[in-house]
Curated annotation (Swiss-Prot):
Binding site for S-adenosyl-L-methionine: 63, 65, 83, 101, 122
Highest taxon above the source species: Bacteria
Gene Ontology cellular component annotations, sorted alphabetically: cytoplasm
Active site: 162
Family assignment from sequence similarity: Belongs to the class I-like SAM-binding methyltransferase superfamily. RNA methyltransferase RlmE family.
Catalytic activity: uridine(2552) in 23S rRNA + S-adenosyl-L-methionine = 2'-O-methyluridine(2552) in 23S rRNA + S-adenosyl-L-homocysteine + H(+)
Cellular compartments annotated: Cytoplasm
One Pfam family named in its UniProt record: FtsJ
Gene3D superfamilies in the cross-refs: Vaccinia Virus protein VP39 (3.40.50.150)
Protein name, UniProt field: Ribosomal RNA large subunit methyltransferase E
């Protein structure tokens, strides 16, 4: 069953309070993390996921995005979930889990179900305490995800990638515009007030050879 978001009235007055309404709702619905509601909102707003699709999820641990995507694509779809950390969540027979670093895995290793209809990246750096360093690392992860999408995303396909807001945001957005016909920036309702993250969504991947 797709994730059911908590109502706005359920959100705590203190945005730093833990667990908040999204955390509680995720746990109640069997998802490992509240991040599921970010993907649910993006999916709802751009009609991202459909039955039978092939999906690549980069930075999949602890597994909420992959669980949601597996439900949406159904038994006729295919899902490859990749993360450096172990993933113990159950996604169903349509899913395969690869434990590895998305920055170092070859495109061939990620191509089990390619070409993909959707490439997802919720990858984020382990924060270091240095804002500049964390932003640079986030940009690097985002650009790696875009490079994977360039190699493995089917024409007409969609991309979702997380990035920390910084002076590199425009470069990241332009790189995705070079790949997709339409690009949107979305900050889901479930994002904590203190977070600097935003999601860039690319729709209608351009045909091979068509850029700019």
């Amino acid at each position: 069953m797709p994730a059911e978001r908590p109502s706005v009235s359920q959100k705590p007055k203190n945005p730093y309070k833990r667990p908040d309404a999204f955390t509680k709702a995720a746990k109640a619905q069997g998802y490992p993390a509240r991040s599921v509601f970010k993907l649910e909102e993006i999916d709802r707003r751009v009609r991202l996921l459909r039955p039978g699709q092939r999906v690549l999820d980069l930075g999949a641990a602890p597994g909420s995005w992959s669980m949601y995507a597996a439900q949406r694509i159904g038994a006729g779809g295919k899902l490859l979930a990749v993360d450096l950390s172990p993933i113990t969540a159950a996604f169903g027979p349509q899913a395969t889990v690869v434990q590895g670093d998305a920055l170092s895995l070859t495109n061939e290793a990620l191509a089990q179900f390619a070409p993909y209809d959707v490439v997802l990246s919720d990858m984020a750096p382990a924060t270091s305490g240095s804002k500049i360093a964390d932003q640079a690392r986030s940009y690097e992860l985002f650009m790696r995800a875009v490079a994977v999408a360039e190699a493995l995303l089917a024409p007409g396909g969609a991309f979702v990638g997380k990035i920390f807001m910084s002076e590199d945001f425009v470069k990241a957005r332009d790189a995705l515009r070079n790949l997709c016909e339409e690009v949107r920036s979305i900050r889901p309702e479930g994002t904590r007030a203190s977070s600097v993250e935003i999601f860039l969504v690319g729709l209608k991947r351009k045909a091979a050879g068509k850029t700019g």
